[in-house]
Amino acid sequence: MKVYLATPMNGKPIEEIKQKISDCASILAKTDIDVFNPFLEVTANDNSIDGIVKDKKPIEMLCNSAKHIEECDGVLFIGSKEDLKQSSGCQVEILIAVSYGKDCFIYENGEISRLVELELIWSFEKVKEKLS
């Protein structure tokens, strides 16, 4: 099995991101699980201020990374459920995985849990003016 490692990056210190990924990857190295790490330090440095990642084009950055989910069996989110709620990029990565039948996991406090249910609620409202 190969998993794509997802973790919040925008607004986070580069060293913290590297440490989270390293900690998780070292645990996975003891298993039969291979990892794809989308974090590129060179790119992070180009998009940081004082060592804090500040994506200038977050959607472009996300798309460049998320395309690699295709090569993986699933996505493993590194962080707490609260971290996930606050990370638009990681939410999108998990939604991509679920939508295409891939497994999703969360690595929190040294434990891995599998996502068993994802509920999306779509609600639309008529637009009063014409779209141009």
For the regions a language model picked out, list residue spans one by one:
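Conserved catalytic or regulatory cores that recognize and/or transform ribose-phosphate-containing ligands
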Residues: 1-132
